[in-house]
């Protein structure tokens, strides 16, 4: 069974948690800038994402790679093993070819990684029957151009009714759009034990700690547009609020890889959806005094039971 989330490869591992291997792990930005020379698959039983990353690093060493980037992980069969896919890079890796953004009706189409870095000045919304995505883009860009936009990013596209009509909303930007103040979604929580230790250490370690109140690149701007049209959630980490008011937050894989768990849990049950699974994890995490958790594995047992394992953090 696939893991809950596609792996967003971790930033450089904390020296507190892992030993250093010869092959280093690249950040998503670094990996996107160069060409890999090979892609490998590593399988094994790993109790945490950090163990999987170290196994990939050892494989990269054997292949003569200077660095690597974990592309994906998944459960391998029903054995509880992981299947980890990674790209390998030479020290003198060629630079990746830069791709230019499409221009439609004179308006530049932005990918998400570029759109989240700048502030839109307005939104446009169109609704109708569109037979293809090019027709959608044509309608959106005409509306954007009418408002004097230089570029656009489609933030919401849904079926409006049972008749095949769609409703599409896009952020629109000026050429000299103001840059947003943002941080990575993979930073260490500032009020966690790992966060306090990193801040005390200072230097590069402190740079991996979140800045409270600063938006992340995982979410677009909330400065313009109507919330239901532009925001899929309130932003920030997924948080479970228990009946007694206790809040427990879920960490993504990249953040968890930079922290050291103080405990772990494993349980099985029949759960209808991931919201229920998250609640069950958070409930058990809170009983052990955890403020954060990271689901490491999920796999289907016989029948409809799901087994879940998670690391816990203070």
Curated annotation (Swiss-Prot):
Designated name of the protein: Protein YdgH
Kindly state which keywords UniProt assigns to this record, in alphabetical order: Signal
Q: Which family does it belong to?
A: To E.coli YjfY.
Biological-process GO terms, alphabetical: response to stress
The signal peptide annotation in the UniProt record is 1-19
Q: Which domain of life is it from?
A: Bacteria
**UniProt entry tagged with the keyword Signal:** yes
Here the disulfide bonds are none
PANTHER family recorded: OUTER MEMBRANE PROTEIN-RELATED-RELATED (PTHR34156), PROTEIN YDGH (PTHR34156:SF2)
* InterPro entries referenced in this protein's UniProt entry, alphabetically: BhsA/McbA_stress_biofilm_assoc, Dodecin-like, YdgH, YdgH-like_sf, YdgH/BhsA/McbA-like_dom
Keyword hit for NAD: no
């Amino acid at each position: 069974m696939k893991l809950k989330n596609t792996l967003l490869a971790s930033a450089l591992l904390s020296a507190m948690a892992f030993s250093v291997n010869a092959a280093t792990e690249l950040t998503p930005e670094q990996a996107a800038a160069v060409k890999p020379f090979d892609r490998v698959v590593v399988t094994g039983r790993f109790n945490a994402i950090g163990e999987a990353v170290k196994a990939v690093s050892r494989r990269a060493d054997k292949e003569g790679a200077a660095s690597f980037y974990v592309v994906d992980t998944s459960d391998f069969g029903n054995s509880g093993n992981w299947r980890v896919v990674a790209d390998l890079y030479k020290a003198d890796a060629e630079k990746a070819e830069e791709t230019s953004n499409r221009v439609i009706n004179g308006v530049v189409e932005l990918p998400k990684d570029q759109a989240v870095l700048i502030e839109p000045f307005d939104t446009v919304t169109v609704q109708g029957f569109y037979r293809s995505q090019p027709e959608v883009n044509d309608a959106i860009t005409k509306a954007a151009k009418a408002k004097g936009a230089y570029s656009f990013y489609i933030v919401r596209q849904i079926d409006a009714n049972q008749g095949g009509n769609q409703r599409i909303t896009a952020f629109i930007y000026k050429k000299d759009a103001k840059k947003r103040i943002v941080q990575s979604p993979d930073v260490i929580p500032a009020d966690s034990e790992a966060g306090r230790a990193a801040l005390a250490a200072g230097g590069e370690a402190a740079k991996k700690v979140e800045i409270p109140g600063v938006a992340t690149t995982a979410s677009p701007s909330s400065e313009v547009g109507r919330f239901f049209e532009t925001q899929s959630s309130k932003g920030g980490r997924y948080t479970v609020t228990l009946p007694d008011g206790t809040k427990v937050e879920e960490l993504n894989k990249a953040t968890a890889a930079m922290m050291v768990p103080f405990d772990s849990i494993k349980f099985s049950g029949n759960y209808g959806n991931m919201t229920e699974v998250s609640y069950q994890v958070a409930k058990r995490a809170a009983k052990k005094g955890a403020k954060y958790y990271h689901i490491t594995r999920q796999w289907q047992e016989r029948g409809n039971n799901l087994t879940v394992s998670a690391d816990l953090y203070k």
